[in-house]
């Protein structure tokens, strides 16, 4: 049996207006582009790094 991949749910809580282009691109990479959007992503070090980069714009809802 294969192990189920861990996932993490992230919600965008603040706008990307007047933010650096790299932060906007990071939000798009996280499948977020509007306030209130929720994305379920694989829990990898890369994803964690992207969340850390825009931690002031998003919140982690659930880790499974």
Swiss-Prot record:
Taking the record's annotation, the residue ranges forming a coiled coil are: none
Keywords recorded for this protein, A-Z = Ribonucleoprotein, Ribosomal protein
Q: Name one GO cellular component term.
A: cytosolic large ribosomal subunit
Q: One biological-process term from Gene Ontology?
A: translation
Q: Name one Pfam family in it.
A: Ribosomal_L30
Q: Which stretches does the entry tag as region Disordered?
A: 1-22
Q: Where is the signal peptide?
A: none
- Please provide, alphabetically and separated by semicolons, the GO molecular function terms listed in this UniProt record: structural constituent of ribosome
The family database entries (CDD domains) matched by this protein are listed as: Ribosomal_L30
Subunit details: Part of the 50S ribosomal subunit.
Q: Which PANTHER family match?
A: LARGE RIBOSOMAL SUBUNIT PROTEIN UL30M, MITOCHONDRIAL RIBOSOMAL PROTEIN L30
The record's annotation in HAMAP family points to: Ribosomal_uL30_B
Question: What's the protein here called?
Answer: Large ribosomal subunit protein uL30
